[in-house]
Every structure is written in structure tokens, then in C-alpha cells.
Amino acid sequence: MGTVEGKKQEKRRALLEAAYDLFLERGAAKTSVEDITSRAKVAKGTFYLYFQDKGAVMQALQGRVSYQLLSDACEAVEKQTELENFPDKMVAVIDHIIEALRKDTLVLKVLERNFIWPGLDQIEASREAEPLMRKLLNVVLTSPEMAGRTEREIYQRITALGSMCMSVCYSSVLEGKPDDIEAMKPVLYDIVRRSLKAEK
């Protein structure tokens, strides 16, 4: 059982890694399912055992990239002990992610504007699952600035702010619109701080 499951996960991982490399090299639009299976060294039919289509692979990759970016950012921010309030910590996390994507625009192109946050329903369904998001949610819920708000309200606000920042990051870094990212950072971070300040 374990061996069979292990082989399944290995094939899925091979497909994801092949797709990721190809998307970085030539872009998703110029990559076919056949290209992915050829690079992964698996039969074309195997692809459809794991993914409905190329879009499903892209979504899985975006989830993986998003998770890694968020994990790295949180680890870095934890070391910044001078950050005392939650809004400043949130800004630091976003800034770390933006800087990582600015330095690696190929990854930004794969991610597009679709930073994927683990669903709150998944967290609520299994409190022991997804340790990163459970840890983050605990930090958020114990922040004085979030007092009086429900978990869902907090999650909605944070994901909306994060999605806004990622969309602006994509446009600013790759297209220079509405301005370059350095010019947009103060605007974004002011919005984040205002949205997360304690309610009176």
C-alpha cells in the first residue's frame, strides 16, 4: 500500500517538476501536455490520472510556489524581533514576497496574479493539518489589532490584501504599471496598515 502510494506521489511530483521547468523555460502557453509527459518520462495517459488538464497543473504549481514564498517570508519575518505589531509584520511578509518575485521574474510569470492561500475551510476542517497556516492564524488571532473580528473576517481581509499586493506586484514588476514597484510599495503598505489597524 505504502509502496504503491509512494510511486503515485513520485509520478505526480515528476509531472509537476517537469511542468515547472518547462513553464520557466518557455511559458505555459507554449508548453503542451505531451511536452510535460516527455520531460517527466511518463506515458501521456499517466498525466490524466493526476491532472484534468494543463490548467490543473498550473494551479497545483501556483499553490506550491505560493506556499514556499509564504513559508520563506514568515521564517524571515520571525527573525525581525523589532517588529512589534501585526500590521508591520504583515507588511514585512508581503515585502519579502515581492522582493523574491522581483528578483526572479520567471517565477512571477508562473505565479501570474494568482497567489494561492490555503482555504480557511481546510484549516477549520482539520486543526492539525497545514501547520504553516495554523501557526499564522494563531499569530493573527492573538494580535490586539484583530480583536473583535471573527476568523473568517480576518481571513477574508488578509487574503484580499495579499491578492491586491500580488496583482500590483505582477503589473508593476513585469509591465511597469501603474508605476514601478518601488513607487507602488508605499501606497500598498499604507493600504495594508490602514486595513489592519485596531478597530475603535
Label each region the model flagged.
Residues 41-51:
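Short hydrophobic/aromatic patch on the recognition helix
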Residues 12-13, 33, 55, 59, ...:
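Short, structured helix-loop boundary elements
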Residues 1-26, 30-39, 56:
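Basic, helix-initiating cap at the start of DNA-binding domains
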Residues 60, 74-103, 157, 161:
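Hydrophobic alpha-helical connector segments
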